[in-house]
Structures are given as structure tokens and as C-alpha cells.
Design a protein with these regions (language model features):
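N-terminal signal-anchor transmembrane alpha helix
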Residues: 4-42
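Juxtamembrane boundary at the C-terminal end of a transmembrane helix
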Residues: 131-144
Length: 144
């Protein structure tokens, strides 16, 4: 396995963020045009969020979520690559994160079953914490 193998799940997460961003704008623009909202009505911060139904606000909320735990994931991937620690365990854990994070986004942006979304988020986040804890143990367990 080459060190750059870790960038496949990295860029899969970037692509997921792009897809949610596009979907969010499709939902927002459709809502704004169907309601014939004016620029003046949208000028006050938070107005769109207050008047938007879940089908519009959920993709926006999910996009915000993609700049929380995934940022830690990106940092860990870069750390693993720079320190040449990428191995099968890390790559598999990274793919676990991507799969559960993608499912979480799909649920959040569509039917939004909260308990399902919670478990998908939990499993994705546990994969990131596993990567972080394992990397920290290896880092601090070495005698330099």
C-alpha cells in the first residue's frame, strides 16, 4: 500500500461536501424562486433559515456539519501522510468514516430520521476518534 492511498477517502469526503453544497443551492434557489422572495427580504441574516422548511434548511445544516468533524479527519489524513504512517488499518477506518458520513448526509438531506442519523453520525465519528487515538498512541509511544 502506498502512502497516498489515504487520499481516496480524503477526496471522497471533499466530493461529498461538494455534492451537499450543490444540493443545498438547488433546494434554496428553488425555494426562493417559488416563494418569489426579494433581495430585501433575504438581506437580514437568518431570515432564510427562519422561513425555510426542513427540505431547504436540512441541506444547509448538513453542509455546516461537514465543516466540523470532517475537518479533524482532513487534519489526521494529512498528519498520517506527512509522517508516513498510512497503513491498511487507517485506510479502512477512513473509508468507514466516509461511508457513514455519506449515509448521514443522505438521511439528513432527505427524510431526516433523527435516530438513524444519530447512529450514522456516531459510527462515522467513532472512526475518526479511532484514527486520532491510534495516531496519538503511536506518536507518543515512540522514543525519539
Amino acid at each position: 500500500m502506498t502512502q497516498d492511498t489515504i487520499f481516496s477517502p480524503f477526496f471522497a469526503t471533499v466530493f461529498l461536501t461538494f455534492l451537499v453544497w450543490v444540493y443545498m443551492y438547488i433546494r434554496r434557489i428553488s425555494f426562493i424562486t417559488s416563494r418569489k422572495l426579494t433581495q430585501k427580504e433575504l438581506a437580514v441574516p437568518g431570515t432564510l433559515a427562519q422561513i425555510s422548511p426542513p427540505s431547504v434548511s436540512n441541506p444547509s445544516d448538513n453542509l455546516k456539519n461537514l465543516f466540523e468533524i470532517p475537518v479533524l479527519f482532513y487534519a489526521l489524513v494529512l498528519y498520517l501522510f506527512i509522517t508516513k504512517q498510512v497503513d491498511t488499518v487507517y485506510v479502512n477506518a477512513a473509508w468507514v468514516f466516509v461511508v457513514f458520513r455519506t449515509l448521514h448526509s443522505a438521511v439528513h438531506c432527505t427524510f431526516n430520521l433523527i435516530i438513524l442519523r444519530f447512529y450514522l453520525y456516531l459510527f462515522a465519528t467513532l472512526a475518526v476518534w479511532f484514527i486520532a487515538i491510534r495516531a496519538a498512541l503511536i506518536h507518543f509511544g515512540t522514543n525519539d
